[in-house]
A protein has these predicted regions:
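Surface-exposed extracellular loop regions of Gram-negative outer-membrane beta-barrel proteins
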Residues: 214-235, 327, 337-360, 371-380, ...
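Membrane-proximal, glycine/serine-rich, low-complexity loop/turn segments characteristic
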Residues: 21, 33, 59-61, 82-94, ...
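A short, solvent-exposed loop/turn motif at the edges and junctions
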Residues: 43-50, 71, 75-87
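Structural motif
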Residues: 25-36
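Short, acidic Ser/Thr/Gly-rich low-complexity loop/linker segments typical of extracellular
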Residues: 47-61
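Conserved C-terminal beta-signal and adjacent last beta-strands/turns
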Residues: 741-764, 770-875
Length: 875
């Protein structure tokens, strides 16, 4: 670090803060000296000091961090026991104090108390009363969540509770936009929040709980009563050097029947309100069945790039939720995005077969427009019947221009590439659920999807840059155009019945089918001449019938699940008078053991066998020009790929103290669809086949967390190994990739002292095949400091990474300093902020990749230094 005295200052400050604290710990027991798990203990300071709270673990242990020389009124409570009150006078040193609670002879269902308990745990719901943890200076939900015990928020807005990721965010029990946490934590004002509920094993439908397993964790934000009938929110506006501007309104109106939300973002800085993750969440998230389709989506390819040198970003999101009556509710949202960005990438490539080097500079301009929407109806005619219907739609338009400057073996070539993409998607979904009795519940799902993509790429060059087997007409100006069109219609029907045999045995039956109709057309032409061997007109249909039986058994505190699925698959392909068909019958087993050792310890074992089928493009019989130097040829004989997946994970969580999260994952891919490379100098002809060599990958990680009342420390180690094979010019190439990651982080959450958020990681990669070996190291340092002094808030962030590639001896260091100063007078609706990003004005980042036939180093230019002055008005 350039200024080590700053770190010394914070270390000294932290040491002084620790020295002013003492620790009281012990056990909470009943009259038979048996531990009480989940008992609440609160310590209220009578003068200066901070309220302390803890919940006893499965052994009855508790820990309180108290301010030295302060008297506390202590309350210890547990459901069904008499609340005990104690006074701790002038606490001066660490002590061990045990508390014994007497059983309440009245056995009340609820203990009536005069104060709000900061944290209340009831089965799978944890409730935080936020006033007990905040000081009123927090601006957004994000700052509130950081102060709650067991809750973490990263820089991107991801929220985890007790080490598990929050997947759905609700406001007053209604989903906020798509349910993703990022929009909520960065936009909902802190002063409207009354309490926060964290719901594990979350289900939209209450009577399905206990039947369908849910890995979802929901966070419900309850608003204060005086905020439910008024408009609230804030508006940010700012100007900066080099004509920078920022306008960010976030306006909300909530009422008992109808809620409205609007979030806008208009700027030409490096700030993005809608990212790749937001789009994937809108599209239903990632799973094995749609992973390939999502990754290859044109929208994903552009949203994935977050490094640009210029940007004009326009974003608007509108959300409405209306309860027409007790039976029918309607919700909808619209999201509009317009992005114009410029970026530059410099590539150094080593083609391993011929040991030829290439330098390629790409100057890219993107104009992207995206419109997303959803309308949903939820109908509950009676308590045990629920019908949900929604329609989602998406319209995308992308115009991309790339100027390429290429140095191949000291030969300079310049050419341009223009891409036009238009995409339309519609998805309709209907789910009906009926509980007939305590023992029988049924579910029916019908799903329709339609997707159309029109894609064209135009290469303009003065030199023939294309593979030799394309009969290019050599002339002064070469114009090559590729057009493709993809249409997909799909419907899914599934019927499921849940049969509860008794309290410990469940039996579930599932039957359904899936139909896909895919049409793909493509051609390649120079001027008005079409190359016949690059014309494709494929109609690909596939029909799947499946049925499964699932047995679930409760064994002590563990749930054992075994499922056997039968799948019949049939496809037909017709492409330019070439007919082919394929049929398979499969049995796919699945086993899971979910053991709740205690309410804080959990062990999960999973094994399942799944499969994926080849995509439409992989089944074409002619060629596609993927890129100017890359030809793809399909294979009509491809079969399915099988995935054996085994995992074992353990969680031992404590609100304060040590928490452990070890896990191991192993995956084997058999009969994998793998690309065969036939290379000629730098040109690749790629053909997919099913290979008999398994693709194996192993990942182990171990995360250790230590939680203290005012700080948290985390250490993570992760190792990944993958072994796979490809074919280059009919030669099998085996690759072995190893990756080692170590990360340490430290974060404080003091009220009236500087807070530090520190993270350091070291990544070592060892990628080897028979042609090349690449060893690289990447170090990342991230330090953020924020401090509140009266009406001022100071915040700074320093990022540093150092990259070294031992194969090329190349090194690169990158550092970025961001800072802000915020001022808001107490009880004033106005706030002002000076914000600076990339203050050191660093230029680029560097990384490398290795494939079976290519080693590449990629230097990416980053957004330049920016200063903006903002005014914020709170409604």
């Amino acid at each position: 670090m350039k200024k080590p005295h700053l770190i010394l200052f914070f270390i000294l400050n932290f040491s002084l803060a620790i020295s002013s604290q003492i620790v009281i710990k012990g056990k909470i027991l009943d009259e038979n000296n048996k531990p009480l798990t989940g008992a609440n203990i609160l310590a209220f300071p009578t003068n200066n000091g901070k309220l302390a709270h803890n919940v006893s673990d499965n052994l009855g242990n508790y820990t309180l961090s108290l301010t030295k020389n302060t008297t506390y009124n202590t309350s210890i409570s547990f459901m069904g026991f008499i609340t005990r009150k104690e006074i701790l006078n002038n606490t001066k040193k660490d002590s061990i104090i045990n508390f014994i609670l007497k059983e309440d002879p009245n056995k009340l269902e609820e203990i009536v108390i005069k104060y709000k308990i900061p944290v209340r745990i009831r089965k799978d719901t944890t409730t935080y009363n936020t006033d007990a943890f905040t000081n009123g200076k927090e601006r957004k939900l994000k700052q509130v969540l950081k102060k709650l015990p067991g809750v973490e928020v990263d820089r991107k807005g991801n929220v985890t509770v007790k080490g598990k990721k929050v997947t759905t965010l609700l406001v007053d029990n209604k989903k906020f936009f798509t349910g993703d946490t990022k929009l909520a934590v960065n936009n909902i004002p802190a002063d409207v929040i009354d309490k926060i509920d964290v719901i594990e094993d979350y289900h939209e439908n209450a009577f399905m709980k206990g039947l369908e397993k849910s890995d979802e964790i929901a966070m419900n934000i309850s608003l204060k009563e005086d905020k439910k009938k008024f408009v609230f929110g804030d508006i940010e506006a700012g100007l900066g050097i080099k004509n920078r501007y920022v306008l960010h309104p976030a306006i909300f109106k909530y009422s008992p029947k109808t809620n409205y939300s609007f979030i806008g973002d208009f700027n030409n800085t490096n700030r993005k309100s809608f990212t790749l993750r937001d789009y994937i969440n809108f599209d239903g998230g990632l799973d094995m069945n749609n992973l390939k389709e999502v990754i290859q989506s044109p929208v994903v390819k552009l949203l994935r790039n977050q490094n640009f040198t210029a940007s004009k970003h326009k974003f608007g999101g509108y959300n409405m939720q209306h309860a027409k009556n007790e039976k029918l509710s309607i919700s909808s949202f619209l999201i509009a995005l317009s992005d114009k960005t410029n970026s530059r990438v410099e590539n150094f490539r080593n083609y391993l077969i011929d040991n030829i080097t290439e330098r390629l500079r790409e100057d890219e301009r993107n104009n992207q427009n995206l419109f997303l929407g959803k309308i949903q109806f939820l109908y509950k005619p009676e308590e045990n019947t629920r019908i949900k219907y929604y329609t989602k739609f998406e319209k995308t338009s992308i115009n991309q221009t790339i100027e390429n400057n290429r140095d191949l073996a000291n030969s300079i070539i310049n050419f341009n590439e223009n891409n036009l993409i238009n995409s339309d998607k519609i998805n309709s979904y209907l789910k009906a659920e009926k509980k007939f009795s305590t023992y029988h519940t049924s579910q029916a799902i019908v799903n329709f999807n339609f997707n159309k993509i029109d894609d064209s790429t135009n290469w303009l060059t003065n030199t023939n840059i294309f593979p030799n087997n394309i009969p290019i007409n050599e002339k002064e100006s070469i114009n090559v155009l590729k057009k493709s069109s993809t249409e997909k219609f799909e419907y899914n029907v599934a019927l499921k019945h849940f049969w509860i045999l008794d309290n410990v045995n469940h039996l579930y039956f599932n039957v359904g089918n899936n139909f896909e109709q895919n049409k793909f057309k493509s051609n390649l032409q120079q001027d008005n001449t079409t190359f016949s061997n690059f014309s494709n007109n494929l109609e690909h249909n596939q029909f799947t019938i499946f049925t499964s039986i699932l047995y679930k058994k409760l064994i002590g505190d563990a749930i054992f699940t075994a499922e056997l699925k039968y799948q019949n698959y049939y496809r037909t392909s017709l492409d330019l008078n070439n007919n082919s068909s394929y049929q398979s019958n499969l049995l796919l087993p699945k086993i899971e053991m979910d053991w709740d050792i205690t309410n804080r310890k959990k062990l999960i074992f999973k094994y399942n066998l799944t499969n994926t089928f080849p995509s439409t493009r992989q089944l074409i019989s002619n060629n596609i020009l993927n890129n100017y130097n890359n030809i793809y040829t399909g294979n009509t004989d491809l079969k399915e790929t099988f995935y054996h997946f085994v995992s074992l994970s353990y969680r031992n969580y404590k609100t304060y103290g040590w928490s452990f999260y070890p896990s191991i994952y192993y995956k084997i891919r058999n009969n994998q669809v793998q690309n065969i490379f036939n290379t000629s100098t730098i040109f690749n002809i790629i053909n997919p086949i099913n290979i008999d060599t398994p693709n194996k990958s192993l990942t182990t990680n171990f995360r250790v967390v230590y939680n203290y009342k005012y700080w948290k420390a985390t250490v993570l180690t992760e190792y990944t190994n993958s072994n796979y094979a490809t074919f280059i010019n009919n030669n099998k190439i085996k690759s072995n990739n190893n990756s080692f990651l170590t990360r340490a982080s430290f974060r404080t959450v003091y009220d009236n002292k500087p807070n530090i958020d520190f993270s350091y990681s070291q990544t070592h990669k060892d990628n080897t095949n028979s042609l090349f070996s690449a060893i690289s190291n990447l170090s990342n340092l991230d330090v953020a400091v924020d401090y509140e002094y009266k009406n001022w808030k100071f915040k700074t962030e320093y990022l540093y990474n150092f990259y070294k590639n031992n194969a090329t001896k190349n090194t690169n260091s990158f550092n970025e300093l961001n800072a802000s100063i915020f001022y808001q007078k107490e009880n004033s609706p106005w706030g002002f902020e000076l914000l600076g990003t990339n203050i050191g004005n660093n230029i680029s980042k560097l990384n490398s990749t290795l494939s079976s036939n290519l080693f590449s180093e990629r230097r990416t230019l980053v957004f330049p230094r920016t200063f903006v002055v903002k005014a914020i008005y709170k409604l």
